[in-house]
């Protein structure tokens, strides 16, 4: 892999708890079109990784095809706040903003943040929550997601501390059991970040596109109304915007082949993401602060016009 390459990793759960890794160098600082095996007008993005067993190239596409079907049943739509008497979408946005900071402080993997948000929304879809308990639900879902995604999840005492001791260790343990029972222990869900990894690879993304796509996608987590869109649609739209912003064509035959969305389907989602970004609460700056650092390429200050 060339200097400056970035590795991203897809992890899928197989039978009996086995772990399947779809890991590959998705980003090259200087993409080399000659290195790809091309069939017709589309690239075989898995050809280079055929000898790497961790990339499960024999059935990686089947994993994503299954995920596209499953996201329909594991995603939520922005109607659940109508059944909440004590909280609203603004409070949800504040909670997610805080969780972005906590996630960064604990140095957790990106997928943990996306799974946390999914668990919160699915729980709120099923249970009414009081305002004082909302943060407890959030930190508990972070714990569950961490146990699922991380090698070393945060300790309970650290979660109690990060909540300024508003809840006890026992409160979190009891809420964990309650959340899992409510969700029928279904925590294996395809998130937007899961799809993003595949789409970045299909787009032969460079480091700038990766950072900008991640920035845009993280920003969607706070926007309650963007739950209208499926995770795969949001991921595809983030890649589309990032590609357009660095001067590439928004879409390509390879992206169409692997994402199964045409450009006309993605443009409305891309516009919704940028409109949500422009109208977001300026006080909720966790995502902006995160991506204003050198580690994330200072992409917060990137000008992203809506010109499509």
Task: Locate the predicted segments by residue.
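Acidic, serine/threonine-rich low-complexity regulatory regions at protein termini
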Residues: 1-139, 143-308
């Amino acid at each position: 892999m060339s200097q400056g390459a970035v590795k991203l990793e897809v992890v899928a759960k197989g039978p009996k708890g086995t772990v399947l890794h779809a890991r590959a160098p998705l980003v090259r600082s200087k993409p080399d079109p000659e290195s790809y095996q091309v069939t017709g007008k589309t690239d075989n993005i898995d050809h280079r990784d055929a000898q790497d067993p961790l990339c499960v190239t024999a059935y990686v596409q089947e994993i994503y095809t299954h995920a596209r079907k499953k996201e329909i049943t594991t995603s939520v739509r922005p109607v659940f706040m109508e059944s909440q008497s004590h909280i609203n979408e603004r409070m949800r946005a504040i909670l997610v903003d805080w969780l972005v900071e906590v996630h960064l402080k604990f140095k957790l993997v990106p997928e943990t943040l996306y799974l946390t948000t999914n668990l919160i929304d699915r729980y709120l879809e099923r249970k009414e929550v009081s305002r004082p308990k909302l943060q407890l639900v959030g930190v508990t879902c972070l714990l569950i997601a961490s146990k699922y995604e991380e090698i070393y999840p945060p300790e309970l005492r650290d979660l109690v501390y990060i909540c300024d001791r508003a809840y006890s260790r026992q409160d979190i343990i009891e809420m964990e059991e309650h959340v899992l029972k409510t969700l029928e222990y279904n925590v294996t869900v395809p998130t937007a970040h899961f799809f993003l990894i595949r789409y970045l690879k299909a787009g032969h993304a460079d480091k700038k596109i990766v950072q900008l796509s991640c920035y845009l996608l993280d920003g969607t987590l706070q926007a309650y109304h963007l739950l209208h869109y499926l995770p795969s649609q949001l991921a595809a739209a983030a890649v589309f915007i990032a590609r357009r912003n660095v001067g590439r064509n928004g879409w390509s035959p390879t992206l169409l082949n692997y994402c199964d969305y045409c450009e006309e389907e993605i443009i409305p989602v891309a516009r919704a993401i940028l409109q949500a970004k422009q109208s977001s609460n300026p006080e909720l700056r966790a995502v902006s602060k995160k991506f204003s650092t050198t580690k994330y390429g200072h992409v917060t200050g990137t000008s992203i016009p809506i010109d499509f």
